[in-house]
Amino acid sequence: MGKHRLRSLALLPLLLRLLLLLLPTDASAPQKPIYMVMVPSLLHAGTPEKACFLFSHLNETVAVRVSLESVRGNQSLFTDLVVDKDLFHCTSFTVPQSSSDEVMFFTVQVKGATHEFRRRSTVLVKKKESLVFAQTDKPIYKPGQTVRFRVVSLDESFHPLNELIPLLYIQDPKNNRIAQWQNFNLEGGLKQLSFPLSSEPTQGSYKVVIRTESGRTVEHPFSVEEFVLPKFEVRVTVPETITILEEEMNVSVCGIYTYGKPVPGRVTVNICRKYSNPSNCFGEESVAFCEKLSQQLDGRGCFSQLVKTKSFQLKRQEYEMQLDVHAKIQEEGTGVEETGKGLTKITRTITKLSFVNVDSHFRQGIPFVGQVLLVDGRGTPIPYETIFIGADEANLYINTTTDKHGLARFSINTDDIMGTSLTVRAKYKDSNACYGFRWLTEENVEAWHTAYAVFSPSRSFLHLESLPDKLRCDQTLEVQAHYILNGEAMQELKELVFYYLMMAKGGIVRAGTHVLPLKQGQMRGHFSILISMETDLAPVARLVLYAILPNGEVVGDTAKYEIENCLANKVDLVFRPNSGLPATRALLSVMASPQSLCGLRAVDQSVLLMKPETELSASLIYDLLPVKDLTGFPQGADQREEDTNGCVKQNDTYINGILYSPVQNTNEEDMYGFLKDMGLKVFTNSNIRKPKVCERLRDNKGIPAAYHLVSQSHMDAFLESSESPTETRRSYFPETWIWDLVVVDSAGVAEVEVTVPDTITEWKAGAFCLSNDTGLGLSPVVQFQAFQPFFVELTMPYSVIRGEAFTLKATVLNYLPTCIRVAVQLEASPDFLAAPEEKEQRSHCICMNQRHTASWAVIPKSLGNVNFTVSAEALNSKELCGNEVPVVPEQGKKDTIIKSLLVEPEGLENEVTFNSLLCPMGAEVSELIALKLPSDVVEESARASVTVLGDILGSAMQNTQDLLKMPYGCGEQNMVLFAPNIYVLDYLNETQQLTQEIKTKAIAYLNTGYQRQLNYKHRDGSYSTFGDKPGRNHANTWLTAFVLKSFAQARKYIFIDEVHITQALLWLSQQQKDNGCFRSSGSLLNNAMKGGVEDEVTLSAYITIALLEMSLPVTHPVVRNALFCLDTAWKSARGGAGGSHVYTKALLAYAFALAGNQDTKKEILKSLDEEAVKEEDSVHWTRPQKPSVSVALWYQPQAPSAEVEMTAYVLLAYLTTEPAPTQEDLTAAMLIVKWLTKQQNSHGGFSSTQDTVVALHALSKYGSATFTRAKKAAQVTIHSSGTFSTKFQVNNNNQLLLQRVTLPTVPGDYTVKVTGEGCVYLQTSLKYSVLPREEEFPFTVVVQTLPGTCEDPKAHTSFQISLNISYTGSRSESNMAIADVKMVSGFIPLKPTVKMLERSVHVSRTEVSNNHVLIYLDKVSNQTVNLSFTVQQDIPIRDLKPAVVKVYDYYEKDEFAVAKYSAPCSTDYGNA
């Protein structure tokens, strides 16, 4: 009995099928009307969609209504569709816009006189999304470069959208917004933008973040790093995979220059198989098995070798299943090294079988066909081998042979398969049955495939042949359809109509029919339909082909076709020619759909080697689609569909005395399942489902309950989507060559003429084009080879000191296929002496891929930048090169390179500036300029110039990024690069002198300054001098207030993230005490602000000024309490003995002026007037303990920072009066301005940072208050007692123009005369050098070198510099100090050793700038600070001169010390 029961269970699927076939049907019954409506289960709001209607066997006119129902109400899609005969038709409709995704009911109602059909089901309606992407001009940037980028928006058909972009910003690695654009419209579907990086940005990964109109966020990454572009590429070629049985593998390494030529040099290759859990405790084997190879590269720049795999123990477990290959090439001659790597996977799979192009379902009566692929462990097909294929259900067991592609085809007869599944097995060889602990055994992988039956009550089937390959666009696909029909089910039908739909990107895009004639006895066969593959079907097309039989059964099949990611706008890009010499012209032709807007880009391949990027490609564009292929029902639209067909009763049946019971079989697929897999919702009264077995309760004695469960088929195989000349002179070396927008003409062509840059490299160019007709198109990447058949490179130091000698080397490289005879010549110049180091030859032979170096011993004679011009020319010579006759190339037969060398005078450079403000007012005014020099001046080092400007801010405007000849490496100093731009813009705006050029430059400086300042921000919103560094994380109250007011004032010109302002203000408010004053946090780098007991008042006054300057009202709680603190302090100081510090008074006067308290301001100004230093035509203020000035000086030195700052605050107080300063105020201000302008340096700045910011603010305010347009030009005449004379004119049109003349004789006396109207600002700059001399300095500096002598052989090329620094001045300690160590000529600092200095508690920061090392010291006391770092030889120099070390107080420039040092081998030539 048990045996019979098991057998009965096995036959259950067959019995159910038999029972269903025996159900009573009436073949002669009249056919009922059939209604079928299909619509995608996912709809897009605002985008045209399609629904397809099929009405068959209509016997009356019907009206069709389609609507969408949601909680927001009903929306009718069709109301006027009336059908009176059979119809197959697809109609477009548009779902109204929606602000969010929403599940809705899609309802279909068909109503006639006697029939009514109504069905509804859920669909998901997604809100409309645009496809937005960004493109940067390159993937990686250096500090200080400009990031250029484009934003593009498309609809889902890839047509351009001129949408509004609400927000776009740049985010740095610390998540700061450093630039922002709001509410801008795209034009032609795109917008091109740019922003400059600061010179010291946070390095790392940045993002362009785009907020679309729908609220979606799109990001595009790029990197900012300090890097040197690779000179050549190291290509490592290794097998992708090897098996554990292989005994050797080939390793190949090639070095290729970016211009495509081989690299000469030596390669070192390391091949390792690492241990999975490495340990340093058990020898090298517990880390990795490694093999090292080293060899000279051949003439092709390559190295190749067969490597034995035995040493890598491929069969051992516990080691990684891969070999890591690292290669390093050292270039011959230069020692430049570049690296490359490769990876080889290890597999124990020796052979592998897989099924190809097989269906997931079979249909009884239609052969089941497919292919089996046999590959080896590397994935390479194995041809002409015998494999076994078996299928138990079909009683099939055969051997077959693979073809030349490793494929074996099979066909299985399904006529006698009675079950619901078919399992096919493919086998090649048995795997090794051995097993060893810690050893790998080889395996031969078999293949299995199970296909499930398709359900049809009439046993009628349709099968679409699948295709193995991805289809090309613009081809016609012939789809083969195989059918088998039940003759009885066809009744008397003469023809059968097959209907088909094609879906792509989640929507219905095509529909059609095929009529099949029917003949008795011919119910089995095949036919084909033709489908044109176009862009509307990409990237995945799904086809459903079906027919409705007379009995209402739907028979059909679906197929999926992958199509290449093609775009309708065909874009091509061509360089003519595609290679050329530097500085020649080339034509870039763009071909696209007429009137397309095209974005062009060409980048140096070296950049892409540095950081490979994912090129803009069709696949990336298709990845933007919200739906590439709709499968199944989306979440929310996956409810169980209603089934009106009822169920089959579970009547027991006895066959041969055995009890059988029908059960639901879940493996068979019906038509409903096929349509659901395509994501189609179907509303029909036809038969598309297999019958459902009625549920029946059973007691425990029956068949186990598990057999009654109905499995719901898979629902959520959801959406594939992605949110996520003859002679050349070379000097121009960009990283991005082309970044342009062009519009093609009506013929679809645009031509751009370009000049080839001087970089010898391969340029990679691409274009995308946007057309309103055809949409987006992408060009293939094209190359332009910028190359010279031979060229010359120079090797020389950055700078030398006059009197030193060096070797100038010129290397000529030949890449012609023939030999050339080259003459190398150094152009003579009066600026240097040069002699060949070898016996001079007229010419040299250089054959293919060879090089020749010529060298000269050079002694510079002139100071400044000295140009060296070297040319290499191919000669027309009959003299043989070996056995070859040298040739002369048609192009590029001569290459000339010009490089400059800085020749500096001996000693230490000084600069003295004399300033005058001359206002003729209709009468002539004159002034004597007496240029004197100290007795110890270095010969020929003196030079002088006079600058004439019509505006007191003119010099500062020209030099806003170079106001001080000092470093800008901390958070305070950076602000002198930022804040003055605000005052310049304000002043020029108010005086209506602002030009677009000045505005653009100033805003760029503000943007970079903003970025840089964020480096010094703390997490709590405060700022400190050197940022949030471990051990130096004390926030600075004073600097935070400075940044806060500057950011607030800059908001009207650039984007400043409000977060930074809000956080800084909150942090400052937390530092306010109960009495309204502010507590100090962090060190003050300028201790002139430390006024003893007045520290708190001075700081509070400064913060109050900052809050008022950022336009906070006096009623603001923080401001109100701060003013209370200041008022209390002033009343206390006024009534007490000794009064208040001048510096504090100046701040108080300006603070009360800003607060509108004019009475208190006047009271303080009156007190200050009593302490003023009044000279003949000027007024200023000094500190009581002002450091004394050396009597040895022959000129009046520039005033210290504190004097300038306090005097500028007094000027601001005079000028801050409502509604405007009085004439009395302006008269007093004029005297202050005359003194201030005399203190300016040659760049328009002052002594230090804070005084420069405050003084320029005050001068700009004075300029605005007194600005008038002169009716008559001012004439300036400068003449000497000799023959020199020159004239300038200053008028309203050129008053911002900087006019300069070099004075011919120094020393000497010159007279300046000014006539006409208006004021003229005159500035004389005198520069000279003096030798360091022994004298008393406020700092003590001792410099030593290790080793101290040249006895150590290493001293020729490397030595250590040791500094011992202490402060011996009048104060207890200095302000922040800078140690400026100049390099000995030919030597460069070893950067890691300089960076290590920052570990010292005394060192806040280090910089390497050209041939100087700058060390920032928080302060220096009488305790000696020891610092040391290492330098190494870069270029050998003879007769080395000593170099100078200067230590100076950043805020008291008169406090400094100098010392000199020499290289251990100063008089030796080193290794030359």
From Swiss-Prot:
Disulfide bonds join C52-C90, C254-C302, C272-C290, C473-C566, C598-C769, C647-C694, C819-C847, C845-C881, C919-C1319, C1077-C1125, C1350-C1465. GO terms for cellular component: extracellular space. The lineage of its organism: Eukaryota, Metazoa, Chordata, Craniata, Vertebrata. GO terms for biological process: acute inflammatory response to antigenic stimulus; acute-phase response; embryonic liver development; luteinization; negative regulation of complement activation, lectin pathway; response to carbon dioxide; response to glucocorticoid; response to nutrient. Is able to inhibit all four classes of proteinases by a unique 'trapping' mechanism. This protein has a peptide stretch, called the 'bait region' which contains specific cleavage sites for different proteinases. When a proteinase cleaves the bait region, a conformational change is induced in the protein which traps the proteinase. The entrapped enzyme remains active against low molecular weight substrates (activity against high molecular weight substrates is greatly reduced). InterPro entries: A-macroglobulin_rcpt-bd (IPR009048), A-macroglobulin_rcpt-bd_sf (IPR036595), A2M/Complement_sys (IPR050473), A2M_N_BRD (IPR011625), A2M_TED (IPR041813), Alpha-macroglob_thiol-ester_cl (IPR047565), Alpha-macroglobulin_TED (IPR011626), Ig-like_fold (IPR013783). Induction: By inflammatory stimulus in liver. The level of this protein increases during acute phase, then decreases again. Highest constitutive expression in ovary. Low level in testis, uterus and non-acute phase liver. Protein found in plasma. Its main location: secreted. Pfam families: A2M, A2M_BRD, A2M_recep, MG2, MG3, MG4, TED_complement. Homotetramer; disulfide-linked. The gene is A2m. Belongs to the protease inhibitor I39 (alpha-2-macroglobulin) family. Keywords: Acute phase, Bait region, Disulfide bond, Glycoprotein, Protease inhibitor, Secreted, Serine protease inhibitor, Signal, Thioester bond. PROSITE patterns: ALPHA_2_MACROGLOBULIN. It is found in: Secreted. This is Alpha-2-macroglobulin. Residues 1-27 form the signal peptide. Transmembrane segments: none annotated.
